[in-house]
């Protein structure tokens, strides 16, 4: 009978990684291998195949079937790096060791690799009976030298993930968190019989492991478990909490926000604040959650957000990583399409692609879709937009049409602030991945002033859906049809009547409205007109037009709209202002782009607003 060995044993014999051995098995380069479930059995006398990979380290064949599978939904580091295409993010470890903050909070949008990175940190730092260095010997961190290798496998680790704690009541949430702690406590079975822990510790361990604890006892579980591990190992543990804010967001939406905030504050205070049984800690989440509410008094907390350059390349894919992946899967010619759909995020100074969408794009035979926005949790944007007023909706409509807007950004924004101050919606949408910071300036008071825009086509689809739904509820279908007929026929009287009626019925106050407001209003209205590509603030002729409607099919007219606004104007001054707007279109030849595209009939509208009054000149 042929003696067989495991992938792990072959990796040790041949001095290569388990991932590499598994790849060789899948590609048929080791004779006699047998697949058993998710693993492989290899003849003990098999020889190590010659390494025919290209210098970059990626093994390529023309046939897609020979490529590594894509890690869709895989957050287990050992599995991801051994069995799937893995993008090496281990230099995160080096950057952390170089700085050594006591507690680090990483805030990034959902599905940007937070859980996989935290499991990577757990695997690297955790002291286990198994030699886990094999998972890093072909990674970038290992090439950095002994200084960094000395941290590998050195610490006990407490690892908790709250990513699935999404329940309707506080009681259900508490029960779920208690079960998570019980499983993690059971993972440290060595504490049950440790001769370095006293009877009091043993009783606490038993209660935690059995899930037989009160809310007060559970809120001190991090402090208690870290103290026991410190006693047993003689070295303080690393504490990692992944997606810490998921139950907090759920608490806000389901009505138990105060309960979860109080619990988390006590839990983190014991685990991270002045805990002498802590080596260092990591947290990840989407929102920072203000220090006053949870991290009160934690002066040892280092917060890393989407606006910070430090660690900016480790969550999501960089352009070089996407190019290499595209080449590996034989899709280098698709790079521009990937950029259009999934690039555009900017973390610090680094351009980042959405990793979830890129991986799904390759898995879907390079057919672009809105993968990220269909992963649930668009309740987030729905909840937020529900709090937006008309002006915010119109500014968001401007974003949909490719514009940028400038606003203050608070990366510590939380749900309750949005109801109190709707302008914080931009901060919320930025940190959750629905906007990107084009340019960031730190103001004198410590806040960020940012130019923001939509990151890519995938996200634009969400806004089109959500914002157009809002406008469709604001604007009756009969009005939209009447507006379209008036625009197509150049009937400025009919168009004026419809817009005037719409302003009177759908918007509450225009006392402080400026040109930007009316710009967004008209963009939203134009977005409802089928058969046109709507663009805004683009160069044409000798300047930039306000709004252009370019027909999708031949036979339809092209439309140029120039907007003006004034306060306290008379009927005559408003009429003159509309004529000034029309003259600007003509003088600056804003119709140049449409004529170059072969559009024969072009209507030009000068539209002037004052409060809820409008005047329109047509040419």
Question: PLM features: residue spans?
Answer:
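Phosphate-binding site recognition
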Residues: 62-514, 529-530
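Alpha-helical DNA-recognition elements
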Residues: 23, 27, 123, 428, ...
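Structural signature of nuclease core domains in nucleic-acid processing machines
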Residues: 492-619
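Polyanion-binding surface elements
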Residues: 1-20
